[in-house]
Swiss-Prot record:
Chief location category: secreted
UniProtKB keywords: Amidation, Neuropeptide, Secreted
Residues where Phenylalanine amide is found: F18
Compartments (UniProt record): Secreted
Record-given protein name: Morphine-modulating neuropeptide A
Organism name: Bos taurus (Bovine)
Amino acid sequence: AGEGLSSPFWSLAAPQRF
């Protein structure tokens, strides 16, 4: 959740994880 702010790409990489 918080990491999404630092790594916006993570949201596209694993949206199911968050």
